[in-house]
Design a protein with these regions (language model features):
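Non-transmembrane, amphipathic alpha-helical segments
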Residues: 37-40, 125, 198
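Inter-helical turn/loop segments and adjacent helix faces that build the functional surface
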Residues: 59, 102-106
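Acidic/His-rich, divalent-metal-binding segments that scaffold phosphate/diphosphate chemistry
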Residues: 1-87, 98
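Post-HEXXH active-site segment of zinc metalloproteases
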Residues: 86-96, 106
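Short alpha-helical catalytic segment bearing the HExxH-like zincin motif
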Residues: 69, 73, 90, 116, ...
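Histidine/acidic-rich helix-loop-helix segments that form or flank divalent-metal centers
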Residues: 11, 105-168
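Terminal helices and disordered tails flanking the catalytic cores of nucleotide-processing hydrolases
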Residues: 141-227
């Protein structure tokens, strides 16, 4: 009752304003902060949601599919408030509960929870357009301001990669059927080789996700073609 606004239709825009969803995201972010992980706040949720939506929009998917990707993107990390381990599955089950309460159609619930449940590289893979867009958006959100550890000497490998990423962009070229991740790395902090060693699994996951969308995943670091 009290957890939901009186809305005729729940949309991505309205979900961003629901206190319950935001409480789970922010608690997950706090937990990960204590454990020494990078930022997983509402800022990350919005970036992933909007990037996932943009990818599908550029590829000509209908508004409904774009909206499903945005909703999955916003809710994909809620399960971090339960535990980092298997957080994709926890997030999917939490989203399932909320979407049922909000009277979402079964097909939409299935698409959203499937995408959320598949987004972690340890346990998942892209299976359709919504999950592919979510994976590409999430795994390419590499940026300096996601690092929360103030002491460079104490950086773990993920801190080092994110801190080294001075700028990054993800571009879809519909004509060439390419999705390109461009990263500007400060190589004094992290070499291109280090980046690949740390994120190889993620990049392979992006390659598979791009293929599901009929695209080739390509990457440039400091202007050099990597893959």
């Amino acid at each position: 009752e009290g957890n939901i606004f009186k809305l005729d239709k729940i949309t991505y825009k309205s979900i961003k304003k629901i206190p319950e969803v935001n409480a789970y995201i922010e608690q997950g972010n706090r937990v990960l902060g204590i454990l020494g992980y990078t930022e997983h706040s509402r800022g990350h949720a919005v970036k992933v949601a909007e990037t996932a939506g943009d990818i599908l929009e550029k590829l000509g998917y209908n508004e409904h599919t774009v909206e499903l990707a945005q909703i999955a993107g916003y809710m994909h990390d809620m399960g971090n408030c339960v535990n980092r381990v298997d957080h994709a599955h926890s997030s999917a089950l939490m989203a399932f509960q909320l979407l049922r309460e909000w009277k979402f159609p079964d097909e939409d619930i299935a698409a959203i929870v499937s995408a959320i449940g598949q987004h972690d590289e340890q346990t998942g893979t892209a299976v359709d357009a919504v999950s592919a867009a979510l994976i590409l958006a999430d795994k390419t959100d590499v940026r300096r301001n996601r690092v929360r550890n103030p002491i460079k000497e104490n950086f773990d490998m993920h801190d080092r990669v994110n801190y080294a990423a001075v700028a990054s962009s993800l571009q879809v070229n519909v004509e060439k059927k390419v999705i390109l991740l461009e990263i500007e790395l400060d190589e004094e902090i992290c070499s291109i080789l280090d980046y690949f060693e740390i994120f190889l699994q993620r990049m392979l996951m992006c390659k598979r996700a791009a293929e599901i969308l009929g695209l080739k995943f390509k990457m440039k670091a400091n202007g050099n073609k990597i893959c």
